[in-house]
Amino acid sequence: MLTFDHILIRYGELALKGKNRHMFEKQLVQNIRSVLKPSFPRLTYHRTFGRILLGLNGEDPLPIKDKLRKIFGIHSFSLAIRVTNELDKMKQAALHALQASEGEVKTFKINARRAYKPFPISSSELNHHLGGYVLANTEQISVDVHSPDVEIKVEVRESGTYIMTGEFKGLGGLPVGTSGKVLLMLSGGIDSPVAGYYLLKRGVTLEAIHFHSPPFTNEKAKQKVVDLAAKLTNFGGQVKLHIVPFTELQKHIHEKVPSNMEMTIMRRMMLRISEGIAKKTDALAIATGESLGQVASQTLHSMNTINEVTTTPVLRPLLTMDKEEVITVAKEIDTFNISILPYEDCCTIFLPPDSKTKPTRQQAKKFEQFVETEAYVQTAIEGTETMVIKSEAAVSKTEMDELL
């Protein structure tokens, strides 16, 4: 009995990776397996040139499709019928695939691809053979090579022939784990989780750092950040979250620095602490959710002054995006409703009404003379707590008790 018993996975950008292609493909298979294996133990995984083939072995394809849609590195995928490389079997499978198509079907097209060159029939000949068979065994259906109701894709490979009629879009990008580690400054707002999402899309392994200032920021604010990190695990596996005690340093800055320079000095301190954590965790870069000109601390002048304190690259994935664009993505990845919960983070307390939009490095150095920078930064790094979030449901009660 013919049935859709495989999923054929395509990847786009990986095909351009030359000699490193094997490494990218291997990581993608590993990521797919780690996502699917716990819930679908009967799946089999086979990597062939330009494709990954999942054998369903009786598993329900619908929930598998939902999970594949969230794995970076996948360009698209299709449900497929696999048959042996025999013309009669291909004809029967093509007809079955058409008959199983949903909706009204009046026109079709065969699109055959002979990836296995020893197969004696060319792609164009296959189109004619299979198309003729489908026409002879259906009524009131015709061929339309330009805009068909159903396109029957046929791929002949060494392991068999795969017949498909639909295609589901993936997220694209690179497989998570192929681009090194990045430490994301996760504030709890709308922007930084979206920045994390785009970093994952470029294949980074993500860790996050959050600055917590109790009692000015409460435990609900901390839980909010944990929940945001958990949302990011849907796209990139586990996330290590580093919680930095920031109260004493923030109070110290508030006491010693003029209000219009507080934000600049605070951001410089955050960057110093982040660099310290990045070095301890072997992160190659720090990332923020900053967008150029959005607030006073995100002008080019501010960024130039704040960046002075680190030699670690600072990535800003959202730099050129409008707020509305960011909000749209936040809703798509399901972080928006968490981000807008009304719990203050450390950047909103002691918020001065007159922050400088063009602070200079000289001004920052002048006022940092009154701040015990090294001692406070080291204390914050040493007091940092770390938790591992493996999925939305993986923050156990014990972990939360330790966190709170």
Curated annotation (Swiss-Prot):
Pathway: Cofactor biosynthesis; thiamine diphosphate biosynthesis. GO terms for biological process: thiamine biosynthetic process; thiamine diphosphate biosynthetic process; thiazole biosynthetic process; tRNA 4-thiouridine biosynthesis. InterPro entries: Rossmann-like_a/b/a_fold (IPR014729), ThiI_AANH (IPR020536), ThiI_fer (IPR054173), ThiI_N (IPR049961), THUMP_dom (IPR004114), THUMP_ThiI (IPR049962), tRNA_STrfase (IPR003720), tRNA_sulfurtransferase_ThiI (IPR050102). Pfam families: ThiI, ThiI_fer, THUMP. It is found in: Cytoplasm. Residues 62-167 form the THUMP domain. Keywords: ATP-binding, Cytoplasm, Nucleotide-binding, RNA-binding, Thiamine biosynthesis, Transferase, tRNA-binding. Its main location: cytoplasm. Disulfide bonds: none annotated. ATP binds at residues 185-186, 210-211, 267, 289, 298. GO terms for cellular component: cytosol. Its EC number is 2.8.1.4. GO terms for molecular function: ATP binding; CCA tRNA nucleotidyltransferase activity; tRNA binding; tRNA-uracil-4 sulfurtransferase activity. It catalyses: [ThiI sulfur-carrier protein]-S-sulfanyl-L-cysteine + a uridine in tRNA + 2 reduced [2Fe-2S]-[ferredoxin] + ATP + H(+) = [ThiI sulfur-carrier protein]-L-cysteine + a 4-thiouridine in tRNA + 2 oxidized [2Fe-2S]-[ferredoxin] + AMP + diphosphate; [ThiS sulfur-carrier protein]-C-terminal Gly-Gly-AMP + S-sulfanyl-L-cysteinyl-[cysteine desulfurase] + AH2 = [ThiS sulfur-carrier protein]-C-terminal-Gly-aminoethanethioate + L-cysteinyl-[cysteine desulfurase] + A + AMP + 2 H(+). Catalyzes the ATP-dependent transfer of a sulfur to tRNA to produce 4-thiouridine in position 8 of tRNAs, which functions as a near-UV photosensor. Also catalyzes the transfer of sulfur to the sulfur carrier protein ThiS, forming ThiS-thiocarboxylate. This is a step in the synthesis of thiazole, in the thiamine biosynthesis pathway. The sulfur is donated as persulfide by IscS. Belongs to the ThiI family. This is Probable tRNA sulfurtransferase. It comes from Halalkalibacterium halodurans (strain ATCC BAA-125 / DSM 18197 / FERM 7344 / JCM 9153 / C-125) (Bacillus halodurans). The lineage of its organism: Bacteria, Bacillati, Bacillota, Bacilli, Bacillales.
